[in-house]
Structure formats: C-alpha cells, structure tokens
C-alpha cells in the first residue's frame, strides 16, 4: 500500500529531472509540465545553474508569485540574471505563454515557506496539501493593474557600494521602469554615501515604503538632504532614527531652520504609528516642533539616550498624539534634576493602553519616585516594566513594589539593586545583596505572586553588561 502511494511522486520527480537534462528544452514542453513540479525543478535548476532552463521556466511559471530571495542567497549572479532575462521575454513580447500567471517577483527577506512546502511535497507526494499551505500573495494596492509585473524588494544600504545582485536588479529596473513597478516596503540605511542613497531613492516609489531605519552618524546638513524624500513616504508606519548629531559648525539659527524643515515632513505622515529616536542630539529644546507635527496617534514611542530639557518633557506630556501609546521607552534620558510631574501626567494619559514601559538609566532618585507612583499603579494593561539603573534605596524600592502589586498583567519586572547593595567604592557587595534580596522576596511573596522579577546591577566595567538576579538569588545573565 505504501508503495502505491509513493510511486506516483517518484515517477513525476524522475520525469521532471529528465526535462532539465534536455538541452533543447522547449516552451511547449514546459506548458505540459504538471504545476507541482515547477517549484522543486526550479530549485534544482537554480542550484545547478541551468540558466536556459531557468529563463524558460520563469516564462511558464504557473503561480502569481516567484519568491526568489531565499534562492539568491546562493552566490551566483549568472542564475539571477537568467531569471531577469526570462522576465524580459514576458515584459517585451506581445505573445505570452498560455499558462503565464506571474505577477510578482518577490525579493523580500521573508520566510522560505513556499520552497520548503513544495520540497516536502515532492518527497512525500502530498501536492494537494502544498497548495493548501501556500500563503496568500500581498499585492501593492497602489499599483494594482498599472504594470504587468511588481518587484518587491527590501533595501539594506549598509556598505559604500551595493551588492552585485542588488546592483544588477536596480540597473535592470531602471531600463524597464515603464514596464514594472518596484515596491520597497522596508528601507534600512546603515552606512552609504548619500549621493548613492539619493540615486536609489529616485528609483523607488516612496509612497510604498512602510518602514524606514536610519542608523548612521549623520550630521544635520546630511539630514536636510534626506528630508524631502521622507515627506513623500506617505504610507510610512515605522520610523527609526539613530545617531543623528549636530555639527559644531552649525549655528543655533541654522539648527532651528534644519529641524523645522525636518519636523514639518511629519505633517504628511498620516500612517505613522511607531517612532524610535536613539541618540538624536537635535531634539534638545526642539521636541515640541516634532510633536506638534504628528498627525496620528502613536502606538510606540521610544526616545532613548537623548538629552532633553524639562520643557521637552512638558511638551511630551501635552501631546495629543501619545494618548494611545502601547510602548513608551525613555531609557537613557537623564531626569535627575527635573520635576517628574510631566512624566506623571504622561503616564495618566496612557494608563488605559500602556503595555511596555522602560525607564532604565534615567537617574531617577528617591525624592522623585513618589511623583509617578499613583499614575503607574493605574497602568492596568502593563505587562513589562523596566526601572534598572536608577539609584534608589531599599525603602523606595519596597514602596515601588507595593504600588505595582495591583497590576495583574505584569509578566516581567526589572528593578535596580538598591543602593544598600553597594560598597563605598561602588562595587556590589554580594553578601549584602543576597540578604536584601531575601528580604525583598519575603515582602513580595507576602503581597502577591509575581510572574517574574529581576534585579539588575550597575554595568560591569569589564563586559559592559549588567547582571540580573531573580528573587531566588540565581544569576540570570551577564
């Protein structure tokens, strides 16, 4: 019985491989090939560098989508060019193959589910299940019906020059821009001369971009060159800015003008939901300019390792676009000498929705903590709270824990080792820390049954990390 089930796929597999061995492979042959043989044979042709077979198989591809990214991880530009040559024949010839369905060339770095499903199907003979397990194609609705082919790509601009596959693709797209639509949903800029970035951005439909990450040591004059492109990304949902610096050669007047040019672009971003800003020095004294230009309710706001004025915090607490936040991260912002009333007001506004709160390394001291406790204890949706790196005493920590007792959704809490845990030289006194943790464990167990509480030390001068310990005195990580 098992033989009768496995024999048909084995015969199909042998027949398919004989097709690949045929040097005079014709389109008529492929048009009679069973659909289920295309994915495994395409993979084999790609791995064996059968360029002519690839070219013809692309033209006869019986699916709407060709997810090529997992295959081009194999370092062979020749096979990639063969696929593009096959697409050329589809785009430029008036007469197309009878079974032609290809509409999407997908070069996004997504899961390899398509190829895995069909490979397993070839081995097991369960082609019907393979068809059922295929994920639906995500189209680009802004270009539906305008061009016969859409090319999905993710752009990671991390070197001075592009890799050879992306260079080949962009050159090919540039020469055929009227015949296809290049759709980029994710753009990462990690390091590349801006003149090269500019030439790439001119080729991309900017309103397709949904996520942008810029992690470069850009000074403000370079940011001004990027600013006009940002304003055209009208479907942008997530923006990450990191390591933006103010050149010492920029005057205060120039800085204000540049910041104004940049922040006014946010008036056009009606889909923005997640905003991440790390080590962005131009925010100091100018956060109100950015906040006043936000036109949507943010779900995520992280402003980390930045210098902010007390007035910036006040503007943040008054911003109408933060009332539905689920994630708030202000770690690394020094608040030691500030009133925390603005933070209290901010927490009151987001109490109904906030799920993640990070106030690590803010330098918050004992006298400041009481200001935020009433608002914090009303954040009933909170599931993660991190407060490490703030030099508070044992008494203040106990008070903090007593206010988070009613937050039933808390799954993870991270607190600093109290000041009493350290010696006069600033190093952790292990015996004292063990005793303090035992006292805290008893106090917490009397109040509630926490899911997970960790206590973090100061940063280690050797490894640069902090160690975490749970209530049972076991080391968590370093």
UniProtKB/Swiss-Prot annotation:
Keywords tagged on the record: Leucine-rich repeat, Repeat
Q: Which InterPro entries match?
A: LRR_dom_sf, PRAME, PRAME_domain
Which BP terms does GO give this entry? negative regulation of apoptotic process; negative regulation of cell differentiation; negative regulation of DNA-templated transcription; positive regulation of cell population proliferation; proteasome-mediated ubiquitin-dependent protein catabolic process
Q: Name one GO molecular function term.
A: ubiquitin-like ligase-substrate adaptor activity
Q: Where are the LRR repeats?
A: 99-126, 181-205, 206-232, 233-268, 269-294, 295-326, 327-347, 351-378, 379-403
Q: Name one GO cellular component term.
A: Cul2-RING ubiquitin ligase complex
Which Gene3D superfamilies does its entry note?
Ribonuclease Inhibitor
Give the protein family: Belongs to the PRAME family.
The record's listing under PANTHER family reads: PRAME FAMILY MEMBER 11-RELATED, SIMILAR TO PREFERENTIALLY EXPRESSED ANTIGEN IN MELANOMA-LIKE 3
Q: This chain belongs to which protein, by name? A: PRAME family member 25
What gene makes this protein? Answer: PRAMEF25
